[in-house]
């Protein structure tokens, strides 16, 4: 097998794992030597030969254990490899699906010359001669043009054996002979039947290879013999009928020197990405899906039929496989064709064979994952093992072989994160390009088809659901509209009724007011008329007096001027004119005065009545009155003038001027007559108009009343019709509701299934809800507009009606009506504005950049607990799931959706099982589009939030996921110009020559094609940061953004709105904090209340217990009384029996007295003896009673034993008395009557006294036992609590001190002297235990004694110091060794036991106990004098030990041997543990004393003392300490050069921003809305992001290098373990 691998790597096929091309500097490999024979390989030129060494280079990173392969069902425990970070797609990478075979890489065409194979343009230089190569078939490729004979086989020339090797596969090397005649090539046949390999003289096509110079022909099923013996072979032609490709005229035996790439496999149709192969059945299912040809037994056809021509003859005919019966025949595919007829054995199916081959391949790969397995090896394996009847189908083996390798390729390069562990970085650059295109081209189309199908299905479902929802919504909307319409109509009706009622009330009020006004006006008119008459009379008298005075003056003047007649005539003519003017002027003045007085009265009326309409009417009426009055005054004046003129005429009859006066009077009359006629005409006209107005107003009022009546009738009819319609609609609604209820009952079972679909359509529902809201808002607006129009129409109608009523001439009223209309319209507008303000306002201001350009997507699914987005992966509660109790969960828990974090942390109800949740993965398609503003926001978010990608995605607007943000940030270009340059042109800096010349993959000269490494090397070697580069890059980005007219700065209104939102959030946060504080305070109060309630409950329990104790005592007393009563009854019965017996005895005695008198002498002696015995018994009983009383006072612990003894003695005494009576009866002693009576009385009194004493003793003992039991229970509870507290404290201290103790124990060595002294101490303790057992029955009042130890009995070398765990520790003395308090306690016990021995020997007298107490007190004084430290502690410990001794003595008095044995065992185990721990502590303290005790601080001493107590319970071994003491190796420094810290300084960033700002100012002379500081901030963010990117790359490679080093260490350990 080793020769095959070496030849394969040199022939020019794809490289095996571990082999690296010559033009790539691989990582320093570790070599493993194998002893094999040397072979020679030929290159392009046949003359040159290079001998290959036996050492094969393999990469240690690729060595794997067989159990780590994922194909193994039960892998063993192997250390976990450190994973890598991310792949080129930006997602976390899974592990390899299969490492069973080595990955193969595609090879690019050869570009250089064949003689120069080390050119860097290609991985492998292929210069092998290619002749007439055979054409083979593989499961995934229609043809395969092999190198150096490809599909053709070969045979060995030395032995002329019949073994023929099949052709190569796409990923396995070609097998060729070393010389001689080549075997026949393999053709293709049906997949159900085996292939046939040719022989040199039998079947086959052209010959094989001979020394790699000449190619062979194409093999067929029935072909000629190939001429392979010479240096030229004859090739045949093939035609593929079944396949798509047609290959003809394969090149014949001429040699050609050219290179040809290995073609890649064609992917199978609908090939999904592979998953982890958990089991063989899982693999088999994937194989069935991806190998349909192999598992179709009926309709399978071969890839093609070849016809080869050769110079040989045909010795074999073609066989029809369909004619062979599977029941009769089974065959073995070997070199020679042998058909064996066996009827009993059946032929296996293809699937079974495939499983067998597959299992064999997998097991072989598990044993050695990187071994080379050829098809012939598998075939021969089955032939050798199953020689009887087995079908070896070579085609199936090839399918398995290629199938496994195909999936390994995809897993390694598309779905894997460990590709760098398998392939070197140079190879990966080529493979990455190929497999990216491979993945995108081959699987994108199929994925799109699937997505389109799924999309169409979803759209159909969504469409159907939408239609259903729309129908439902329309029904609901119609119902709502009808309801709203009915409500509106009802409201309108109510409003109309209210308006009508108000109008009627107003009209009634107006009529009443008008009547009152008219009455008032009539009264006022009468008063005015009376006043006017008085004034007129007074005026007339004044006028008469004036006229008389005038006439006198006129007469005088006439007399004086009688001579001047002519002049007087002229003067009289002028005076007449003046008088007329004066009269008119006086009339006007009177009218004005009257009008002014009337206006004043009218103003007073206005103030009283407060109605503008009536005031105007009053004004008009008063004006008409004033005009009439003025006319009346004028008429009176004219009449007075006429009377005056008549009187003057009478007086002037005798005078000569009479004629002149007549003429004047005539003229005046004419003038007055004309004036009066005009006034009369005006009055007539005014009266006519008033009459017309009154008639019109009356008619209008009548018409209005008629119209109102008609309207009321119409409204009543309409209301009746509406009520009928409403009743009909209600009936219809009831029917519809009944139908809906039925439907709802039917759909209740379907709701659970619909909920899941509704969750998937969350986005559509949200959009629909938004649309519905908008529609509702629009509908409301339309309704409001309609209502406003209706109101306006009504107002107009009302205005017209009021105008007709009030009249057109009333100008003041018309003005006020217009004002009322305007007020009503304004009120309606205000109501509309209020309703609009209640609705959600639509912002008219310009939105910010985030709001305008980015719409935040609502999540499809939200976590029910933490409200996080769980649309990609979520856990949903399954329907009809059960709780922990077994009960089904109620319906209100569904649907419960939880995110991954809540599920893993258990953030859900405690009674719900985790198995009742179902994991649902719904990965959304990645959105590749990124706008410029989204990138800018991403950069700003990185500057603000740094590594928190969730907040960065929220800052962008939620349109991108955190994973998409990270991938886009990594894909952003840093600076492409500098990658085009050569790295050699840059200064190297601080790097040494060794790093440059070495093969280190992380050096500058290594991996030129890796852009990331070149960038890291470039920036690390720079002495100063490249500020110009960063500035120019930032300037370009910002100019592109600023010059785009789309992007504008947000307005001030939006900024104010944002600030308001922030303020609101702050207020909300404060409110939340206050609420939280209040809730906490409430919780504290509740806790306090609960504690108080608990205390009350405890008190109640205690009271109940006391009451129960009292009841128990009462019961005991009752029982005692009952016992006494029973005893009394028994005594009475006994007395009666005795009396009867006595009477009988008396009768017998009388009869026998005669006989007994003779024997009296002999019986008197017997009587005397019996009397003496009775007296002795009584004396003993009295002594016993006295002893019992003393015993009860001395020791309470032995009450139980004394009771038993007393009861036995009492029983014995009673029995003796009874026996004596019986003996007397049996012996028939003759006693006198007096003596018998006396004896009977004595016996009765004695029995009564004894029973009383027994009852008293029993009661005392019973009460005493109860008290003892209570004390014991209390002591046990206290001891348990103390032990639990000590255990908890010791566990905490042990954890902290184990490390120190273990380190000290590993360095310490135990001393022989101390071990001997400890052994002596342990032996003394054991002796003391034995002594304590012997003295278990002794009675000691240990509660009153304080037992201590004499220092003289202790060893001199070991002074004692006590450090109990519960008390504070004391510093260590200068002595080398210490002992613990437990030993002191046990030595005290030993001394107590010795004193007990002495007391037992002296019959337990009280005097000896007192002496023991005095001796013990002396020992306490001595110890206290010699122990100045911790006296209180010792006393406490002694008291505790004495309490324990009391319990031991009580248990020992009960003589329980079983408890003794158990205690002995426990004590022995404890002593052994203590001895071991003391030895360790002594060793530690010796070392501390030698190294320097004085240098340690007090804190360290305290820690050592606490450790000495806690280590007693921990049993450690030296093996554990040896492992823990192994110190880890020091961390290695990274080989990557660290970046220059000046590059990350603040000065560098500021310089870069200033340079970029200058370039922007120079290049663009426009005016931007942004300010200078804002532009500088943008530049700064871009520069920092670029720096941040480099920093992340450096960290990535540092972690990557550390992972490689860890893997190297890991594999070195594995190799060492295998070698060992």
UniProtKB/Swiss-Prot annotation:
GO terms for cellular component: nucleus. Keywords: Nucleus. Residues 1-13, 1338-1350 have a biased composition (Polar residues). Residues 1-57, 176-204, 294-318, 450-849, 1049-1506 are annotated as: Disordered. Residues 498-511, 799-834, 1467-1481, 1493-1504 have a biased composition (Acidic residues). Residues 28-57, 570-598, 629-645, 1303-1325, 1358-1382, 1390-1416 have a biased composition (Low complexity). SUPFAM superfamilies: Homeodomain-like. It is found in: Nucleus. Residues 310-421 form the SWIRM domain. Residues 925-977 form the SANT domain. Residues 177-187 have a biased composition (Gly residues). Residues 450-497, 512-568, 606-628, 647-798, 1051-1195, 1219-1255, 1264-1302 have a biased composition (Basic and acidic residues). CDD domains: SANT. This is Myb-like protein X. It comes from Dictyostelium discoideum (Social amoeba). The gene is mybX.
């Amino acid at each position: 097998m080793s020769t095959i691998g070496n030849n394969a790597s040199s022939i020019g096929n794809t490289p095996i794992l571990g082999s690296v091309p010559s033009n790539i500097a691989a990582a320093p490999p570790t070599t493993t030597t194998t002893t094999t024979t040397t072979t020679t390989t030929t290159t392009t030129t046949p003359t040159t030969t290079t001998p290959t060494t036996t050492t094969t280079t393999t990469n240690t990173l690729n060595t794997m254990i067989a159990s780590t392969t994922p194909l193994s069902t039960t892998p063993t425990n192997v250390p976990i490899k450190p994973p890598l970070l991310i792949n080129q797609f930006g997602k976390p990478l899974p592990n390899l699906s299969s490492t069973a075979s080595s990955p193969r890489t595609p090879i690019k065409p050869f570009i250089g010359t064949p003689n120069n194979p080390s050119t860097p343009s290609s991985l492998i230089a292929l210069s092998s001669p290619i002749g007439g190569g055979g054409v083979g078939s593989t499961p995934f490729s229609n043809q395969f043009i092999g190198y150096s004979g490809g599909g053709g086989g070969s045979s060995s020339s030395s032995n002329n054996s019949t073994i023929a090797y099949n052709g190569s596969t796409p990923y396995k090397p070609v097998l060729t002979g070393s010389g001689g005649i080549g075997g026949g090539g393999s053709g293709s046949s049906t997949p159900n039947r085996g292939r046939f390999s040719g022989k040199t003289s039998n079947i086959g096509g052209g010959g094989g290879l001979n020394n790699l110079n000449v190619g062979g022909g194409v093999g067929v099923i029935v072909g000629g013999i190939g001429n392979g013996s010479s240096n030229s072979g004859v090739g045949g032609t093939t035609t593929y009928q079944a396949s798509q490709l047609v290959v003809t005229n394969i090149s014949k035996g001429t040699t050609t020197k050219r290179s040809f790439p290995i073609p890649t496999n064609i992917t199978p149709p609908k090939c999904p990405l592979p998953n982890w192969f958990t089991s063989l059945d899982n693999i088999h299912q994937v194989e069935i899906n991806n190998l349909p040809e192999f598992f179709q037994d009926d309709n399978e056809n071969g890839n093609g039929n070849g016809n080869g021509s050769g110079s040989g003859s045909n010795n074999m005919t073609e066989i029809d496989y369909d004619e062979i019966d599977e029941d009769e025949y089974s065959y073995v595919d070997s070199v020679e064709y042998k058909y064996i007829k066996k009827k009993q054995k059946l032929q296996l199916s293809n699937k079974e064979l495939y499983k067998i081959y597959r299992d064999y391949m997998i097991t072989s790969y598990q044993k050695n994952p990187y071994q080379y397995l050829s098809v012939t090896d598998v075939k021969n394996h089955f032939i050798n093992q199953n020689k009887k009847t087995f079908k070896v189908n070579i085609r199936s083996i090839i399918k398995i072989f290629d199938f496994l390798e195909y999936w390994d390729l995809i897993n390694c390069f598309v779905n894997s994160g460990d590709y760098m562990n398998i392939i070197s970085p140079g190879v990966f650059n080529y493979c990455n390009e190929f497999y990216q295109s491979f993945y995108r081209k081959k699987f994108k189309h199929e994925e799109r088809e699937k997505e389109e199908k799924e999309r169409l299905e979803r759209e159909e479902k969504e469409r159907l659901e939408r239609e259903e929802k729309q129908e439902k919504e329309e029904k609901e909307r119609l119902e709502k509209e009808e309801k709203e319409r009915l409500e509106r109509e009802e409201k309108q009706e109510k409003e109309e009724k209210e308006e009508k009622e108000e109008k009627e009330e107003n009209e009634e009020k107006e009529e009443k007011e008008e009547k009152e006004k008219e009455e008032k006006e009539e009264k006022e008119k009468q008063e005015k008329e009376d006043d006017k008459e008085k004034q007129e009379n007074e005026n007339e008298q004044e006028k008469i007096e004036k006229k008389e005075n005038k006439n006198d003056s006129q007469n005088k003047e006439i007399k004086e001027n009688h001579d001047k007649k002519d002049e007087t005539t002229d003067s009289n003519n002028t005076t007449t004119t003046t008088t007329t003017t004066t009269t008119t002027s006086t009339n006007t003045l009177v009218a004005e005065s009257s009008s002014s007085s009337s206006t004043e009265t009218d103003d007073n009326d206005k103030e009283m009545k407060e109605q503008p309409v009536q005031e105007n009417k009053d004004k008009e009426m008063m004006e008409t009155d004033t005009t009439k009055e003025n006319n009346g005054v004028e008429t009176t004046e004219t009449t007075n003038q006429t009377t005056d003129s008549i009187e003057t005429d009478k007086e002037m009859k005798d005078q000569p001027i009479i004629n002149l006066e007549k003429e004047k009077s005539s003229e005046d009359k004419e003038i007055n007559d004309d004036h009066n006629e005009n006034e009369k005409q005006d009055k007539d006209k005014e009266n006519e108009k008033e009459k017309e107005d009154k008639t019109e107003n009356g008619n209008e009022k009548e018409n209005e009343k008629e119209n109102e009546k008609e309207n009321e009738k119409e409204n009543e009819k309409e209301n009746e019709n509406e009520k009928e319609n409403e009743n009909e609609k209600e009936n219809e609604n009831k029917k519809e509701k009944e139908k809906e209820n039925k439907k709802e009952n039917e759909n209740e079972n379907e709701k659970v299934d619909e909920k899941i679909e509704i969750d998937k359509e969350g986005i559509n529902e949200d959009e629909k809800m938004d649309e519905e809201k908008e529609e509702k808002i629009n509908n409301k607006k339309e309704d409001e507009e309609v209502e406003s129009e209706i109101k306006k129409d009504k107002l107009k109608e009302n205005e017209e009606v009021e105008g007709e009523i009030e009249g057109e001439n009333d100008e003041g009223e018309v003005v006020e009506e217009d004002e009322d209309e305007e007020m009503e319209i304004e009120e309606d507008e205000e109501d509309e504005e209020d309703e609009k303000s209640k609705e959600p306002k639509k912002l008219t201001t310009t939105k910010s950049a985030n709001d305008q350009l980015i719409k935040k997507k609502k999540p499809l699914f939200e976590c029910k607990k933490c409200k996080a987005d769980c649309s990609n992966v979520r856990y949903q509660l399954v329907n009809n799931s059960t709780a922990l109790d077994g009960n089904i969960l109620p319906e209100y828990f569904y649907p419960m959706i939880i995110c991954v974090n809540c599920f893993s942390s258990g953030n859900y109800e405690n009674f719900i099982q985790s198995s009742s949740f179902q994991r649902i993965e719904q990965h959304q398609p990645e959105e590749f589009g990124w706008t410029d503003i989204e990138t800018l926001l991403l950069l700003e978010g990185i500057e603000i939030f740094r590594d928190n990608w969730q907040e960065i995605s929220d800052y962008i607007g939620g349109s991108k996921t955190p994973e998409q943000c990270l991938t886009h940030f990594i894909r952003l270009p840093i600076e492409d110009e500098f990658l085009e340059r050569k790295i050699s042109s840059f200064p190297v800096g601080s790097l040494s020559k060794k790093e440059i010349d070495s093969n280190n993959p992380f050096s500058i000269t290594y991996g030129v094609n890796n852009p990331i490494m070149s960038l890291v090397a470039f920036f690390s070697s720079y002495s100063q940061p490249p500020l110009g580069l960063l500035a120019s890059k930032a300037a370009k980005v910002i100019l592109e953004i600023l010059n785009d007219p789309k992007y504008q700065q947000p307005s001030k209104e939006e900024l104010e709105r944002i600030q308001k939102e922030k303020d609101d959030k702050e207020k909300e946060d404060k409110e939340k904090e206050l609420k939280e504080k209040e809730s906490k305070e409430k919780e504290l109060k509740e806790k306090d209340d609960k504690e108080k309630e608990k205390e009350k409950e405890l008190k109640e329990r205690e009271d109940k217990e006391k009451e129960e104790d009292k009841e128990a005592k009462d019961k005991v007393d009752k029982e005692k009384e009952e016992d006494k009563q029973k005893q009394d009854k028994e005594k009475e019965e006994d007395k009666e029996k005795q009396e009867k017996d006595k009477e009988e005895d008396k009768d017998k005695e009388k009869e026998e007295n005669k006989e007994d008198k003779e024997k009296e002498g002999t019986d008197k002696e017997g009587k005397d003896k019996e009397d003496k015995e009775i007296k002795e018994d009584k004396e003993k009983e009295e002594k016993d009673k006295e002893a019992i009383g003393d015993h009860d006072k001395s020791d309470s612990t032995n009450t139980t034993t004394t009771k038993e003894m007393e009861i036995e003695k009492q029983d014995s005494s009673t029995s003796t008395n009874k026996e004596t009576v019986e003996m007397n009866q049996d012996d028939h002693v003759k006693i006198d009557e007096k003596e018998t009576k006396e004896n009977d009385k004595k016996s009765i009194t004695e029995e009564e006294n004894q029973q009383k004493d027994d009852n008293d003793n029993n009661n005392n003992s019973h009460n005493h036992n109860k008290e003892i039991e209570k004390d014991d229970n209390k002591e046990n509870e206290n001891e348990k609590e103390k032990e639990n507290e000590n255990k908890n404290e010791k566990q905490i201290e042990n954890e902290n001190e184990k490390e120190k103790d273990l380190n000290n124990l590993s360095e310490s060595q135990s001393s022989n002297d101390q071990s001997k002294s400890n052994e002596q101490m342990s032996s003394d303790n054991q002796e003391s235990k034995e002594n304590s057992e012997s003295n278990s029955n002794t009675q000691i009042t240990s509660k009153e004694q304080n037992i201590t130890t004499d220092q003289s009995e202790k060893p001199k070398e070991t002074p004692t110091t006590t450090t109990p765990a519960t008390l504070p520790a004391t510093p260590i003395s200068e002595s080398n060794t210490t002992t613990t308090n437990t030993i002191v306690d046990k030595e005290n016990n030993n001394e107590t036991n010795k004193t007990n021995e002495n007391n037992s020997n002296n019959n337990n007298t009280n005097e000896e106990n007192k002496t023991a107490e005095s001796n013990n007190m002396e020992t306490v004084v001595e110890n206290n004098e010699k122990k100045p430290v911790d006296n209180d502690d010792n006393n406490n410990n002694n008291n505790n030990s004495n309490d324990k001794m009391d319990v031991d003595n009580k248990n020992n008095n009960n003589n329980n041997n079983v408890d003794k044995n158990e205690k002995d065992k426990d004590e022995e185990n404890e002593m052994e543990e203590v001895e071991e721990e003391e030895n360790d502590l002594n060793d530690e303290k010796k070392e501390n004393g030698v190294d320097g005790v004085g240098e340690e601080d007090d804190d360290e001493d305290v820690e050592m003392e606490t450790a000495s107590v806690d280590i007693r319970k921990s049993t450690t071994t030296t093996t554990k300490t040896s492992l823990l003491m192994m110190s880890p190796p020091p961390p290695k420094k990274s080989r990557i050069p660290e970046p220059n810290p000046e590059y990350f300084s603040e000065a560098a960033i500021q310089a870069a921003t200033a340079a970029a700002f200058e370039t922007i100012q120079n290049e663009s002379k426009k005016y931007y809305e942004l300010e200078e500081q804002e532009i500088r901030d943008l530049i700064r963010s871009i520069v920092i992001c670029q720096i941040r990117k480099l920093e992340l790359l450096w960290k990535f490679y540092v972690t990557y290098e550390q992972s490689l080093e860890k893997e190297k260490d890991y594999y070195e350990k594995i190799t060492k373990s295998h070698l060992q």
